[in-house]
Design a protein with these regions (language model features):
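Rossmann-like NAD(P) dinucleotide-binding subdomain of oxidoreductase/dehydrogenase enzymes
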Residues: 143-294, 318, 419
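ALDH superfamily catalytic-core signature
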Residues: 250, 258-399, 428, 462
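Glycine-rich loop-to-alpha-helix module at the N-terminal edge of alpha/beta enzyme cores
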Residues: 52-143
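Conserved C-terminal structural/oligomerization subdomain of aldehyde/semialdehyde dehydrogenase
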Residues: 50-53, 248, 285, 339-340, ...
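Hydrophobic face of amphipathic alpha-helices that form TPR/SEL1-like repeat modules
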Residues: 1-48, 73, 134
């Protein structure tokens, strides 16, 4: 299969003007700066390999400046004493600005990440908007409690009055990945600022453009200088410096389990708090009573959406034996019908993966599966002028110990396995180091809820997959992470509980 990809240009004036700058800057303490070293990194369009522009190659010195700015802002009364309703208005204003610039942001995300324009326009940027709106409300719901105690040794005639107060944890370092940049960034920023923290954001070096544009909107929204800071650069330099920094009180990270473990090690120096949303190898389970007109495209989209670059992607497909061949054939047919192309082409259904490095990694997994005896039913090719397109791939004849079954591929590759009964599929689904998500496809609600209870996963969808909302917690069990993003409890990730006990 060949693939012709033409270079397409953004249609919005905002995106064209943004790219025309060539070299971008970082935001530190309310000022736009180059890296201390003066070094830059090229940022590429993964569909074509063309250079879109340059970003500062921030490193330890830049992180030091950003953390210092965030600490000053945290201690400054202009932010520290801001009322909850005032913080709420700032977050709501940010949502309005994202909405007003949605088309521009969608084009920048498509060019920088490769994803089809419609993914940003109708899914991810609206998702980011809703994060800011939701946590604008949560900013006014932070409260402590009064506590009746059983203390009985206070002075005669005195009483005990005890209560808890919730206080912002301090300076937060947020490190976000390249697969869904703007919505994952919003999932860190919105609850942290709702809680009253300040932040240093380190976006992925492959996809920093929308983070820079978002930083501009943060300034326009009216956040005080230093409340939000942006440092771009390589993960092993800027990201590592942020994770280890003694002036950072908390790290909020989304990314691979391997990097999550490195961040855990780096945080030891000052025992900073962590939330980690990490990798997954999520099962999609189809029972023989499922509505296959719903289930077949559902499980196909569970893995092929965003070229499989989704932490909760349904990358392990388990199908009851009676319907296994029919479902695999249907998913294969669906895969072959998907149109690959440039993200700005409105007919594109599947864009490239984020980089040649990632494409080579995915292709390596497919080759490993073949070597171990698996059968590629459809797909498996690596295409395009930059070698960054991966054909949607369906693999069968797999065994539980194979690499393609056990390891997170993070591409449009699904491995399919038959099963006989609920006990067997429970064992198969839970036979993983991960525990991020799962889905069950069935017309029997008893079976659905029995499996939902049995699966060791942070989220279980029934007759759907990858349904997100700002109100719904997302996070994993086992090696898929610590803590939860989204939902009202996400604000607690950024709060300390103080106990006050008084004799009155």
């Amino acid at each position: 299969m060949s693939l012709l990809v033409t270079s397409l240009q953004p249609q919005t004036k905002g995106a064209r003007a943004f790219l025309a700058r060539g070299t971008q800057r970082m935001l530190i303490g309310g000022e736009w700066r180059s890296a201390v070293s003066g070094e830059t990194l090229d940022t590429l369009n993964p569909a074509t390999g063309e250079v879109l522009g340059r970003i500062p190659a921030g490193a330890e010195a830049d992180v030091d400046q950003a953390v210092a700015a965030a600490r000053r802002a945290f201690d400054d009364p202009s932010w520290r004493d801001l009322t909850p309703s005032a913080r709420s208005r700032l977050l709501w204003r940010m949502a309005e600005l994202l909405e007003a610039n949605l088309d521009e942001l969608a084009e920048l995300e498509s060019l920088d990440n490769g994803k089809p324009l419609w993914v940003g326009k109708y899914a991810e940027i609206p998702g980011a908007i809703e994060q800011f709106r939701y946590f604008a409300g949560e900013a006014m719901r932070i409260e402590g409690t009064t506590i009746p105690t059983s203390i009985n040794y206070q002075p005669a005639g005195k009483k005990i009055f005890a209560y808890t107060a919730k206080e912002p944890i301090g300076v937060v370092g947020a490190i976000v990945p390249w697969n869904s940049p703007i919505v994952l960034t919003a999932m860190k920023i919105a609850p942290a600022l709702a809680a009253g923290c300040t932040m240093v954001l380190k976006p992925a070096e492959d996809t920093s453009l929308t983070a820079i544009r978002l930083a501009e909107l943060m300034v326009e929204a009216g956040f005080p200088p230093g409340v939000f800071n942006l440092v771009t650069g390589l993960g092993e330099r800027a990201g590592a410096a942020l994770a280890a920094h003694a002036g950072v009180d908390k790290i909020a990270f989304t990314g691979s389990t391997e990097v999550g473990k490195l961040i855990l090690d780096a945080a030891r120096g000052n025992l900073k708090k962590l939330t980690l949303e990490l990798g997954g190898k999520s099962p999609a389970v189809v029972l023989d009573d499922a509505d296959l007109e719903l289930a077949i495209p559902g499980v196909a989209n569970a893995i092929f959406f965003n070229s499989g670059q989704v932490c909760v992607a349904g990358s392990r497909l388990y199908v009851q034996r009676k319907i296994f061949d029919k479902v695999v054939a249907g998913v294969g047919e669906y895969a072959r019908g998907l149109k690959l192309g440039h993200g700005l082409d409105p007919s594109t259904q599947l864009g490239p993966v984020v980089s040649r490095l990632q494409a080579d990694r995915i292709a390596g997994y497919v080759a490993a599966g073949r070597r171990e005896g698996a059968t590629v039913v459809t797909g498996g090719g690596q295409l395009g002028p930059a070698g960054t397109f991966i054909e949607p791939t369906v693999i069968v004849d797999v065994k539980p110990a194979m690499q393609v079954v056990r390891e997170e591929i993070f591409g449009p590759v699904v491995v399919a396995t038959p099963f006989d009964d609920l006990n067997e599929v429970t064992t198969l689904a839970n036979d993983t180091d991960y525990g991020l998500a799962a889905s069950v496809w069935t017309s029997n609600l008893s079976s659905a809820h029995r499996l939902a209870s049995a699966f060791r996963a942070g989220t279980v969808w029934i007759n759907c997959h990858s349904m997100f909302d700002a109100s719904l917690p997302i996070g994993g069990m086992k090696q898929s992470g610590w803590g939860r993003d989204s939902g009202h409890q996400a604000v607690d990730n950024y709060l300390e509980t103080k106990t006050v006990c008084a004799v009155i």
